[in-house]
Amino acid sequence: MFLKGKTALITGSTSGIGAGYAKALAAEGAAVMINGFGDAGEIESLRQELESLSGAKAAYSNADMTRPEEIRQMCADCAEQLGSVDILINNAGIQFVAPVDEFPEDKWNAVMDIILGSAFHATKAVVPGMKEKGWGRIINTGSMHSK
């Protein structure tokens, strides 16, 4: 198991590709903290699946990715519960589809807060620990689609 002894924090990981990242990292032995929203039972099932894949602990944070203080607390909780964050995958995102000339500014701001804001705040929170250890990986994901 390539990542045994490492801890990964993945935002936007209670379903979809984020859950896929979590499973892949757990299968390589990483302890994983997932984050997102959804059905509590499904999230708990995913958390248990991650533990069975890795043999390491898995945890869940319901931090709101638009709130910097919750993002900082999520990163601190991950370090406290699972060990310092070695791998951060900034995967949280939302989408709203409209032609640019019809795109509401409030929707644009919400998209940017989640995608860029959460990546900035999570990265800022974990980098000091990575520097202290002399090891860390940060992966920023995104997707786009067009009409």
Model-identified regions with their sequence ranges:
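Conserved glycine-rich cofactor-binding loop
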Residues: T7, T14-G16
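Conserved glycine-rich Rossmann-like NAD(P)H-binding loop of the short-chain dehydrogenase/reductase
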Residues: E28-S45
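The beta1-alpha1 cofactor-binding region of Rossmann-like NAD(H)/NADP(H)-dependent oxidoreductases
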Residues: A40, S61-M74, E105
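Conserved NAD(P)H cofactor-binding loop of Rossmann-fold oxidoreductase domains
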Residues: N91-F96
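Substrate-binding pocket helix/loop in short-chain dehydrogenase/reductase
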Residues: P99-V100, P104-M112
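A short, exposed helix-loop element centered on a Lys and neighboring polar residues
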Residues: T123-K124
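Catalytic loop of short-chain dehydrogenase/reductase
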Residues: I139-K147
